[in-house]
Amino acid sequence: MKIIKVTVVYALPKIQYICQVDIALGSTVKDAILKSNLLNLTNDVSFHHNRIGIYNKTVHLKFKIKDGDRIEIYRNLTIDPKEWRRNNVFLSKKLKKIY
């Protein structure tokens, strides 16, 4: 049985969890995340609530991983990007009027 190395990553605003995992060839994304023990390190990660990808491309939990893959667990957005931009433009216009 051949062993491959993958990286499992979960980033928060102030801390990043990066875990190197040695796992059998033919394993799935779910197997690598479970082996990384990331689910026990933080309560924010869930298979049902977080999207998962490899190098910024969304994949399913049953996706077969390859040697050197970087498995990324994505956080949910706290605000809609359009709403954030709208608020940001409003604030910048308001600040310009003051000066």
Curated annotation (Swiss-Prot):
InterPro entries: Mopterin_synth/thiamin_S_b, RnfH, RnfH_sf. Pfam families: Ub-RnfH. Belongs to the UPF0125 (RnfH) family. This is UPF0125 protein BU253. It comes from Buchnera aphidicola subsp. Acyrthosiphon pisum (strain APS). The lineage of its organism: Bacteria, Pseudomonadati, Pseudomonadota, Gammaproteobacteria, Enterobacterales.
